[in-house]
């Protein structure tokens, strides 16, 4: 959606060529040979028009030229010279894994090291965690990746339309890989399969879409008594619940991590192949990098939104943030070295930022349950890495549609059916139906049933 001809559902398609010198190789890397034409297709699969792509330094469309031979750029192992100086690394658990998996309906209950939670799987979100508990205590009612947006940097027509919602437009579940032992997952693995519906409503088997395994997490804690020289040290083992999806050229490795200290993390790793477009040889542009002769990989952002429906010892939770500030010089602070921390309650729904200069950290609290040592409310702290918010301006359709992409944190009051940060229907959406719009209701979220959306991302 870009505000032009949006009343009719159409597809802007980009074309690539399989290497003519190796045309029998079905897995040839066609992203190394983008073509300078782009058909626009109607919903009944008719070609409406063919756009000619700009391949120079500006938006000018040059004259089409006959195809000239280009070098291949293959990724398959049989086309690579492999290293021979690496010794085997084996992950062996002679007594098997320490977790248990129990089937319950279409879901699986996993138990490991005081953790207990249910894993579900659906077409849009892929893996979903329910009823996450630690040592019998409730932590989270539901956790899932809500959506992601990938806006591209090239401002020229038709590349300005490249801003996919990989979950809303496609689906993390339906695009999940059939995971294999050895590279996708290591160790003593338990695989979880699923059955989804295809585009005609028929059952569609999805084998091995989730792998569950343990891994070493490095040193968990250590202290050496320098007086005696004696060290106490423990390793940190982690439970990993992982899925991998393929969305056209990109792969995403998505994993929930649980450790023995009660910490819970969500990780996304981007891999696969960059989305490419043609460029005249010898040309450079500021919105991309030439990665192969005549091939441009455009800069782009990946902005993810993790939906956290908390239940920290119950559903009456609040969101607060702590900051550290220097004390002014005074009789109490004559040397100017003191500083304090203060806590602020987030009272209404809205979008909020992490201020790293003030060491601002957000926490989800339950003031009805107190720490037995210091009397403070029990809480889970949110550790989110810094990332650059969406660079499309506020009047652009990219910004209007990706309602989660402008803030590190969104907090809203829970309402049934509000699951997707970019809105329920993202294909050619206009905005106004996602988490920014829900937050604008300015509802009270103190000691209430709230939902927190945590954003993170990369720009490359």
What are these regions (language model features)?
Residues 1-4, 18-263, 269, 273-460:
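Extended effector regions of multi-domain proteins
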Residues 2-14:
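Long, charge-dense tracts
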């Amino acid at each position: 959606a870009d505000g032009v001809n949006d009343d009719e559902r159409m597809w802007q398609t980009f074309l690539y060529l399989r290497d003519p010198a190796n045309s029998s190789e079905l897995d040839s890397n066609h992203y190394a040979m983008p073509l300078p034409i782009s058909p626009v297709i109607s919903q009944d699969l008719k070609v409406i028009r063919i756009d000619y792509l700009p391949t120079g330094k500006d938006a000018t469309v040059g004259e089409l030229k006959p195809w000239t031979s280009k070098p291949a750029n293959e990724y398959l192992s049989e086309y690579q010279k492999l290293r021979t100086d690496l010794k085997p690394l084996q992950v062996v658990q002679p007594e098997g894994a320490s977790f248990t998996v129990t089937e319950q309906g279409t879901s699986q209950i996993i138990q490991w090291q005081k953790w207990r939670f249910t894993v579900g799987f659906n077409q849009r979100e892929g893996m979903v965690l329910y009823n996450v508990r630690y040592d019998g205590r409730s932590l989270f009612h539901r956790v899932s990746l809500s959506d992601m947006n990938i806006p591209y940097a090239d401002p020229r027509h038709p590349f300005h339309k490249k801003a996919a919602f990989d979950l809303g437009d496609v689906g993390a579940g339906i695009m999940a890989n059939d995971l294999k032992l050895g590279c996708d997952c290591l160790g003593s693995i338990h695989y979880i399969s699923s059955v989804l519906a295809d585009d005609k409503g028929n059952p569609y088997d999805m084998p091995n879409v989730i792998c569950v395994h343990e891994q070493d997490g490095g040193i968990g804690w250590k202290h050496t008594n320098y007086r005696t020289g004696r060290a106490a040290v423990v390793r940190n083992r982690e439970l990993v619940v992982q899925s991998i999806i393929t969305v056209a050229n990109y792969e995403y490795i998505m994993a929930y991590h649980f450790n023995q200290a009660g910490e819970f993390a969500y990780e996304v790793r981007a891999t696969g192949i960059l989305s490419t477009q043609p460029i005249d040889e010898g040309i450079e542009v500021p919105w991309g990098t030439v990665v192969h002769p005549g091939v441009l990989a455009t800069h782009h952002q990946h902005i993810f939104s993790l939906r956290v429906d908390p239940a920290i010892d119950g559903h009456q939770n609040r969101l607060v943030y702590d900051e550290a500030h220097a004390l002014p010089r005074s009789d109490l602070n004559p040397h100017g070295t003191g500083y304090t921390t203060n806590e602020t309650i987030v009272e209404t729904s809205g979008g909020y930022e992490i201020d790293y200069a003030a060491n601002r950290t957000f926490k989800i609290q339950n003031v009805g349950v107190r720490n037995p040592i210091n009397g403070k409310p029990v809480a889970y702290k949110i550790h989110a890495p810094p990332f650059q918010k969406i660079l499309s301006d506020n009047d652009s359709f990219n910004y209007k549609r990706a309602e989660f992409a402008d803030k590190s944190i969104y907090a809203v009051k829970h309402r049934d059916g509000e699951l997707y940060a970019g809105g329920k229907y993202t294909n050619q959406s206009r905005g106004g139906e996602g988490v920014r719009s829900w937050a604008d209701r300015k509802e009270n979220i103190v000691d209430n049933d709230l939902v927190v959306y945590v954003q993170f991302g990369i720009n490359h």
